[in-house]
Amino acid sequence: MQDRQKAQDYRALLLADTPLIDVRAPIEFEQGAMPGAINLPLMMDDERAAVGTCYKRQGADAALALGHRLVCGDIRQQRLEAWKAAYQRFPNGYLCCARGGQRSHIVQRWLQETGIDCPLIEGGYKALRQTAIQATWQLAQKPILLIGGCTGSGKTQLVRQQPNGVDLEGLARHRGSSFGRTLNPQLSQASFENKLAVELLKINARQTLKRWVLEDEGRTIGANHLPECLRERMAQAPIAVVEDPFALRLERLREEYFIRMHHDFTHAYGDEAGWQAYSEYLHHGLFAIRRRLGLQRFAELTDTLDRALAEQLSSGSTDGHMAWLVPLLNEYYDPMYRYQLEKKAANIVFRGPWQDVANWLKAQ
C-alpha cells in the first residue's frame, strides 16, 4: 500500500485503466472525467454550492463546518457504504477529487476509520487532465495518415482494422454527419479529450508506432471538436482516398443507418417506442441540414422519407429509403466532401477501391 500511496505516475495510471472513485460533485464530473472513473460524490451539487457560498462569505473554517453538518448521520453513512462497496469492487482503485485536496482526504480518512486504506490521486483530476492534454500534444507530433472518401466508403471500418488506427468517431460516439448520432450520448468535450488521450497512450504503448491512421474528419464530430494540436497535424497529413462504386456505398449506408439503427432502437426501447425513436432520428438528421438543402427540397425529401418509413414499417423493406438517400448523396454530401477534398488534393498519396487501399496500407 505504501508504494501505491506514493505512486503518482499519472501516465501509468491512465494506461492501466486505473479505477477512480471520483468524489467530486456530479456537475463537476459531467463537465469532465477520466475513462473508468465512477462518480460517488462527497457532496451533491446543492451541498457543494452552499459550502462554496459559505467559504466566500465566512471563510474556510466555516465552510468546512457546514460541509460536515450537511454530510452527517444517515447521509454520511450511505455515502460511506457506497465508497466501501466501490473499493471492494475495485481494490486497485484510487480516490480522486478536483485537486487532491480536502474532499479526497476526508473520504480517505473516513474509509481508514473502517479499516480501508485507499490511496488518492495527488493533484486530483486536474493533474490527470493536464497529463492527458500533454500526452495528446506529444503523441500528435508523430506522423499521421488520413483515410478519406465519400460517405459510405467504409473509412471507419478501415481505420479500425489498423493496429495503429484511432477510431475518432467511436471515441466521440458520433459518425460525423447530421445522421451521425448513436444511442449513446456524446461525452463532454473534456471527457472526450481525456478518452482520446488514453487511447493514444494505449496504442502507442502496444507497438513501435511509425504513424497514426485516422479518418479524415472536420474540426468537429457531432458536439465534440478535435484538439487543436491534432487538427493542425491532420491538416498537413497525407490522405489515402477510398473510391468505391456508388451502389456499394449505398449498401453500406443501408446496413448502417436503416437496418442497424432500427435494430438498435427497437432493442433498446422495444418495438413501438423503438420505431418512434428511429423515425425521429432520421427526421432529425434531415431537419438539421434543411437550410443547406433549401426548404422546398427539404420538404420533398421529408415526404419521401415518410413514405419510406411507412414501407419499412409495413413490409420490413428498406428499399424506399434509397429514393431520398440517393439525391441526398448526389446533391449534398458528395459535392460537399469532394469540394473539401479538392482543397487538399496535394496531400493525396493513394486512391482506389476499399480493398486496394487496405492492401496499400498493409504494404506501408
Swiss-Prot record:
Residues 14-137 form the Rhodanese domain. One of its GO terms (biological process) is tRNA wobble uridine modification. It catalyses: 5-methylaminomethyl-2-thiouridine(34) in tRNA + selenophosphate + (2E)-geranyl diphosphate + H2O + H(+) = 5-methylaminomethyl-2-selenouridine(34) in tRNA + (2E)-thiogeraniol + phosphate + diphosphate; 5-methylaminomethyl-2-thiouridine(34) in tRNA + (2E)-geranyl diphosphate = 5-methylaminomethyl-S-(2E)-geranyl-thiouridine(34) in tRNA + diphosphate; 5-methylaminomethyl-S-(2E)-geranyl-thiouridine(34) in tRNA + selenophosphate + H(+) = 5-methylaminomethyl-2-(Se-phospho)selenouridine(34) in tRNA + (2E)-thiogeraniol; 5-methylaminomethyl-2-(Se-phospho)selenouridine(34) in tRNA + H2O = 5-methylaminomethyl-2-selenouridine(34) in tRNA + phosphate. It is an enzyme of class 2 (transferase). GO terms for molecular function: transferase activity, transferring alkyl or aryl (other than methyl) groups; tRNA 2-selenouridine synthase activity. The active site is at C97. The keyword Transferase applies. Keywords: Selenium, Transferase. Its EC number is 2.9.1.3. Pfam families: Rhodanese. Involved in the post-transcriptional modification of the uridine at the wobble position (U34) of tRNA(Lys), tRNA(Glu) and tRNA(Gln). Catalyzes the conversion of 2-thiouridine (S2U-RNA) to 2-selenouridine (Se2U-RNA). Acts in a two-step process involving geranylation of 2-thiouridine (S2U) to S-geranyl-2-thiouridine (geS2U) and subsequent selenation of the latter derivative to 2-selenouridine (Se2U) in the tRNA chain. Monomer. Belongs to the SelU family. This is tRNA 2-selenouridine synthase.
